[in-house]
Amino acid sequence: MIQEDYNMSENIIYCYSGSGHCLNMAKTIAEKLGDTDIVLMRSFPEKTDATEAKRVGFVFPCYGGGLPGHVEDYVKAIKIAPDAYKFAVEQFAGYMGCGLHKIDEIVDLDYSNLISNHSTCIWLMPHTLCVPPTSKENARARIDRKAMEVAAAAKAMKHSEKKPPKKAFFALEDKLFSQMHSKRVKKFWVNDDCIGCGTCVRVCPQGNIQLTEKRPSFGTNCIGCLSCVQYCPKQAINVGKITEKRERFPNPNVKAADLTKKIIHID
């Protein structure tokens, strides 16, 4: 049973998701663990006191070689019991980056894992350009298998043999990503297929999109989640020319409304 809930559960998974793939993975893990709160980190987490949780997990993607948005600051605000079991899993497109290492530095992970999802990075590396090439269906199947692996490890409280590597190059890229992205956000535009439904406004975690006469206008506070691009029902939103001919692939099990929730409880 899935519901919104604010009581303390046995397990908590903190999740950041832009195209729904990480949230779907978090749900799969939670269903296997049972009695789990999934706390969204698209904005400041609704629940930061995790001191009563037996297990605390983190599910997130790699953005620009590091953590997405303000996730690093959010994780620093979370209170975890000293004896809690802590795990994390990262999804990435071309390379793993240093996100797992950053989480480990903050919370001292007991277990970590990662999965390459070549079908998620619409503007950097679409799955048709990846080596080896893969389909959306195959990518999702791989993620589902990885979710089951992580869930089994977390349930058994398995410990990883090695800590996540720092990857100095990716740490440098992470610092430069915000500068590069600030130029990219100026290239958002909407074609004539837009119906003014406001989905983009609702899924933007930064409040960066406004509707003016039923047309979205974009501010400069974008963190690159691309939820607006992925979940537009008419595929009317683009970033420059690069996304025009690239297919969208939001997770079919995650609706736009799911991304706007603060906490999802799974029994």
Predicted regions and their residues:
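A charged, amphipathic alpha-helical module
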Residues: 162-170, 178-197, 207-212
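Iron-sulfur cluster-binding cysteine motifs and their immediate structural context
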Residues: 189-190, 195, 199-217, 223, ...
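FMN-binding flavodoxin-like domain, especially the glycine-rich phosphate-binding loop
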Residues: 2-12, 20-25, 31-46, 50-60, ...
